[in-house]
């Protein structure tokens, strides 16, 4: 008999920005490439990257990601990169123009949501986001708590345990 192939996650997430999903309401998502140096890719493959407090901007028709922390490569030498440098995002012209219009219209921003490899290339999931107010965050927490309790009660009923 032939050996079965292992089910492999096609796009394993390297880093995700959970804080962004808590602080912002994500309206739309985009996949884009990113221009990196060799030592940056090596550091990312080691799992050393932080999306916290990073954001994207559009300047002079080009998309840039700022405050993306990629620590220096541990086995690098004088060729190491600057950890907090601004990096260029790769998007089609139509996407950049569309995002520029949406960001300029209202109180929206571009937030990186996750980093993952796709066919050997690093991709950034970029979200068009709108900031949440404190009461919105509290409502979300309350809604999640209620959903969790409903699931818990259903589990008890299925198991025959009455509360």
UniProtKB/Swiss-Prot annotation:
Main location: cytoplasm
GO molecular function, one term: RNA binding
Swiss-Prot/TrEMBL keywords: Cytoplasm, RNA-binding
InterPro entries assigned to the protein according to its UniProt record, in alphabetical order: SmpB, SsrA-bd_prot, SsrA-bd_prot_CS
UniProt entry tagged with the keyword Cytoplasm: yes
Cellular localisation: Cytoplasm
GO cellular component: cytosol
Protein's GO biological process: trans-translation
Superkingdom of origin: Bacteria
Pfam families referenced in this protein's UniProt entry, alphabetically: SmpB (PF01668)
Disulfide bonds: none
Keyword RNA-binding: yes
Annotated family: Belongs to the SmpB family.
Physiological role: Required for rescue of stalled ribosomes mediated by trans-translation. Binds to transfer-messenger RNA (tmRNA), required for stable association of tmRNA with ribosomes. tmRNA and SmpB together mimic tRNA shape, replacing the anticodon stem-loop with SmpB. tmRNA is encoded by the ssrA gene; the 2 termini fold to resemble tRNA(Ala) and it encodes a 'tag peptide', a short internal open reading frame. During trans-translation Ala-aminoacylated tmRNA acts like a tRNA, entering the A-site of stalled ribosomes, displacing the stalled mRNA.
The protein, known as: SsrA-binding protein
Organism in which the protein naturally occurs: Corynebacterium diphtheriae (strain ATCC 700971 / NCTC 13129 / Biotype gravis)
Lineage: Bacteria, Bacillati, Actinomycetota, Actinomycetes, Mycobacteriales
């Amino acid at each position: 008999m032939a050996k079965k192939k292992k089910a492999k996650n096609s796009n394993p997430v390297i880093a995700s920005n959970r804080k962004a999903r808590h602080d912002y309401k994500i309206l739309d998502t985009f996949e884009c490439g990113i221009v990196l140096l060799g030592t940056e890719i090596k550091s990312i493959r080691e799992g050393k990257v932080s999306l916290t407090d990073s954001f994207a901007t559009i300047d002079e028709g080009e998309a840039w990601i700022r405050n993306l922390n990629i620590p220096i490569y541990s086995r690098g030498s004088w060729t190491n990169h600057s950890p907090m440098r601004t990096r260029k995002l790769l998007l089609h012209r139509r996407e950049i123009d569309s995002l520029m219009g949406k960001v300029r219209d209202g109180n929206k921003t571009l937030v990186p949501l996750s980093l993952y490899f796709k066919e050997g290339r690093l991709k950034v999931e970029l979200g068009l986001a709108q900031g949440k107010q404190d009461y919105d965050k509290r409502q979300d927490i309350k809604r999640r708590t209620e959903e969790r309790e409903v699931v818990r009660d259903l589990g008890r009923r299925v198991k025959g345990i009455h509360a």
